[in-house]
A protein has these predicted regions:
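His/Asp/Glu-enriched, well-ordered alpha-helical/loop segment
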Residues: 119-197
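Short glycine-/small-residue-rich flexible loop motifs, especially phosphate/cofactor-binding loops
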Residues: 10, 39, 66, 93, ...
Length: 200
């Protein structure tokens, strides 16, 4: 988002086929109230939004703290576990508790905060809001099988049942991102993966 954008800009973007905003907070708009107005316009025209969460990442970015995230009210709390520089855990807990929006845990983030976030979301009975991403390509590169590695991390160290961690990566993410996959439903695009339980 850039300063000076008005409602008609979002209408024009939607008419041109734009359906996703880049991360709120990486452009010139960083204040919560200003971002909230633009996020509302985007939502009005069917454009989904994600907000940067945590410390600066690219040149021109800055700290986006819990208060800005809550005020902006984007559809997805992007990389809640940071791009390695996560918010303090008590702030992550506040975001889980005070927002009703999707919570994105990423592979290229702080692993400890990612694990704790998944546990906290389960305690709050809001695991349906957890989605997974890689946050790549980023400064830490592109991780092959990053989503699978994140599923394994949450299932092994996060006390998340494996089938639930897979749901974060597939159905939850598809629902929040508006993807035509990730759920087994009539009319959806599907790949079939046959799995067996681990042998011990």
């Amino acid at each position: 988002l850039e300063k000076g954008m008005v409602e008609s800009d979002f209408k024009e973007l939607a008419e041109a086929g734009v359906g996703l905003l880049g991360e709120v907070g990486l452009g010139s708009v960083k204040a919560g109230a200003e971002a909230a107005q633009m996020v509302a316009w985007a939502r009005k025209y069917g454009i989904r939004s994600t907000i940067h969460t945590g410390g600066p990442s690219i040149p021109g970015s800055g700290l986006i703290d819990k208060d800005v995230v809550l005020e902006a009210d984007a559809d997805v709390i992007g990389h809640i576990n940071g791009g390695h520089t996560a918010l303090p855990y008590k702030h992550v807990c506040a975001l889980c508790e005070q927002s009703s929006r999707a919570i994105e845990i990423v592979h290229n983030g702080n692993e400890r905060i990612g694990v704790l976030t998944a546990r906290h979301a389960r305690e709050l009975k809001c695991a349906h809001r957890v989605i997974l991403g890689t946050d790549g390509p980023a400064g830490s590169g592109v991780q092959p099988l990053g989503i699978l590695r994140l599923v394994a991390l949450l299932a092994s160290l996060g006390d998340v049942p494996p089938e639930e961690a897979i749901c974060y990566a597939t159905g939850n993410t598809a629902r929040v991102r508006g993807l035509d996959c990730g759920l087994i439903e009539v009319g959806r695009t599907a790949d079939f993966v046959f799995m067996d339980r681990a042998q011990e």
